[in-house]
Amino acid sequence: MEIQAAIVLIIVFFLLLAFSVPVSFSIISASLVTLIMFLTPHFGVFISAQKMVTGIDSFTLLAVPFFVLAGLLMSNGGIAKRLINLAMLVLGKVPGSLAMTNIAGNAMFGSISGSGIAAATAIGGVMQPLENEQGYDRAFSAAANVASAPVGQLIPPTASFIVFSAASGGVSVAALLMAGWIPGLLWALLCMVVAFVYGKKHGYVIKRDHLTAKVVLKTIWDAIPSLFLIVIIIGGILSGYFTPTEASGVAVVYLSLIHISEPTRLQLIS
């Protein structure tokens, strides 16, 4: 009976996917159909509702929507642009600096927002036109953006470790966050090495005027609030001041305060 139920579940799931039903609805529908077929209809519906409620009844998983909201606030508040300016300031006229800026921006933005897709969209949306203006190969620009987008899923703070902790039965979130630093930074560094070698080979060097001390200080000052968020979240979790879920709420409040203090930068999220 278990084998038959598994077969029905798989067939219904892929059949719904073939008709372009969203994955989440396909999972729910396939599970519900399987339960109804192998249990009484009333009991199957009851079990489905109970499992859905208990499945999301997790204080730890509550951090995920908060980190998603934090990512939306970052995408719509000019924070991505400030991180890009800081990365460009540091990298300067290094060969392949625009692609390296894209990679560094994805790492910083993705770690704060917890979303590789949000990082690729926000950072890539700003960097792609700049790279095109400097004569970068479009395929190379897209590859640098896509390859570095998931880096933020390893560099803390990131919601993926929180989900893993909840699914694995309570692995220490603090330990996971600290363990993500080395592979995340190594991934970003290797991507930047490839961008440097490719940029040097093809002569991808940006031309810009000499930066004044005022511009340098302003760029650093604008990026400090965004970078300080990492210090608040990681420091708060490791010091025990708040849990990862509470840290996600603090991130939302902190970003909201940044937007309130600079209302001209804030774009309403529809």
In which residue ranges do the predicted regions lie?
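Single conserved hydrophobic/aromatic residue that forms the stacking wall/gate
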Residues: 258-270
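Transmembrane helix boundary and interhelical junction motifs in multipass membrane proteins
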Residues: 22-28, 80-83, 114-124, 154-161, ...
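Hydrophobic mid-bilayer segments of alpha-helices in multi-pass membrane transport proteins
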Residues: 4-14, 21-40, 62-69, 185-191, ...
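Alpha-helical membrane-interface segments at transmembrane helix boundaries
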Residues: 49-58, 88-92, 174-178, 182, ...
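Membrane-interfacial amphipathic/re-entrant helices at transmembrane-helix boundaries
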Residues: 2-7, 39-56, 204-223
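Membrane-embedded alpha-helical segments and adjacent helix-loop junctions characteristic
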Residues: 41-132
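Alpha-helical transmembrane segments of multi-pass membrane proteins
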Residues: 64, 96-110, 134-151, 176, ...
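Juxtamembrane and boundary regions of transmembrane helices in multi-pass small-molecule transporters
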Residues: 168-171, 175-211
